[in-house]
From Swiss-Prot:
This is Phospho-N-acetylmuramoyl-pentapeptide-transferase. Keywords: Cell cycle, Cell division, Cell inner membrane, Cell membrane, Cell shape, Cell wall biogenesis/degradation, Magnesium, Membrane, Metal-binding, Peptidoglycan synthesis, Transferase, Transmembrane, Transmembrane helix. It comes from Pelodictyon phaeoclathratiforme (strain DSM 5477 / BU-1). The gene is mraY. Its EC number is 2.7.8.13. It is a multi-pass membrane protein.
Length: 368
């Protein structure tokens, strides 16, 4: 909105200094600062309101240390989503299809998460929204993103082709499997972030690091010179994704002001599903979805721990008549909680791992 306003004024009067609005780095920085300030200023009043209505009960099977979170308001993801949407509307070329596809993903999965949180907190329905309806919501989003990027001419440059990390000339063409793969990636990543949201600051901090990395890739992919030099797909208009990415990063950082241990608020499924879908769609749009197991490695490990736990339990129960577990509790962060690690230590160590995964993903730009 500000972008179009200043551009209109500049076209009329050609005022000195207004050309800066055309620079991606300026608008990405402005979007980041705006998202941070909105979160910090709106946060206190928003938390006060949520405390009167939306207190999420802690699960009975949660670790003992988790029981003290029984009075925390949930649906904090609404604050993240609001900050992102406003800053992106102000500073991005929001009519760009890359931008509104990401915004659509955040809003849609935010609504799915809100319904889930509302059913748990207000209607007192144990488990919230059933897994079936969550899956329907995720598949619907995947169909929209997949079909739009498949059929819209503005995405026809690469269409169903993607690159393989660490290989200079190796590409994969999904062909008619493209749309099912888009559905799978959006579903998997949104669920992975949702599983990770179990400790104060863990999901928000990890998401900020991952999106910062993807934002860097977006900036490079949107510049023809950098893309050719680094041998990554050139995405016309893809640089706008960097503006959105920085808004997401700083909205998460602002949320950490209130969500760091001891948390005043938790994001709930409203935030975790929205952030997960944003990560997935950004990666898909810049053709770096095969990099997700590395750059979003912490989410991958959390999901893997749950999958292994369930599969091993079912196998041992079928084989020996009694189910056994690999971990004390899944997801992985709860395993370390039950081993006696302090919550802050787990979160910071997981952040460190996420930074290492981020740096390793940057190395793929040259290790080809």
């Amino acid at each position: 909105m500000i972008y179009y306003l200043l551009r209109y004024i500049n076209d009329l009067f050609d005022l000195p200094g207004l050309h800066v609005i055309e620079y991606l780095t300026f608008r990405a920085s402005a979007a980041a600062i705006t998202a941070l300030l909105i979160t910090l200023f709106v946060g206190p009043g928003f938390i006060k309101y949520l405390k009167t209505r939306f207190i999420e009960p802690v699960k009975e099977e949660a670790p003992p240390e988790h029981k003290k979170k029984n009075k925390l308001p949930t649906m904090g993801g609404l604050l993240i989503i609001f900050s992102i949407e406003i800053s992106v509307l102000l500073w991005s070329k929001f009519i760009d299809p890359h931008v509104w596809l990401i915004m659509l993903a955040i809003l849609w999965m935010g609504i799915i998460g809100f319904i889930d949180d509302y059913r748990k907190v207000v209607l007192k329905i144990k488990g919230g929204l059933s897994a079936r309806y969550k899956l329907i919501g995720q598949v619907t989003l995947g169909l929209v993103v997949g079909c739009y990027t498949w059929y819209d001419p503005s995405f026809s440059v690469l269409l169903s082709t993607t690159t393989v990390p660490f290989f200079k000339y190796l590409t994969i063409d999904y062909g008619y499997f493209y749309i099912p793969i888009v559905i799978f990636i959006i579903t998997a990543v949104s669920n992975a972030v949702n599983l990770t949201d179990g400790l104060d600051g863990l999901a928000a901090g990890s998401s900020a690091i991952v999106v910062m990395g993807l934002g860097g890739f977006s900036y490079l992919a949107g510049n023809a010179v950098y893309a050719v030099y680094l041998n990554i797909p050139f995405i016309p208009g893809g640089g706008e994704i960097a503006v959105v990415s920085m808004a997401i990063v700083m909205a998460c950082v602002g949320f950490l002001w209130f969500n760091s241990n001891p948390a005043e608020i938790i994001m709930g499924d409203t935030g975790s599903l929205a952030l997960g879908s944003a990560i997935a769609v950004i990666a898909l749009l810049i053709k770096q979805e095969l990099l997700l197991p590395l750059i979003a490695g912490i989410f991958f490990l959390e999901t893997l721990s749950v999958s292994l736990q369930v599969l091993y339990f079912k196998y041992t129960k079928m084989r020996y008549g009694q189910g056994k577990r690999i971990f004390l509790m899944a997801p992985l962060h709860h395993h370390f909680q039950l081993k006696g690690w302090a919550e802050q230590k787990i979160v910071i160590r997981f952040w460190i791992l996420t930074i290492l995964f981020f740096l390793a993903s940057l190395m793929t730009l040259k290790l080809r």
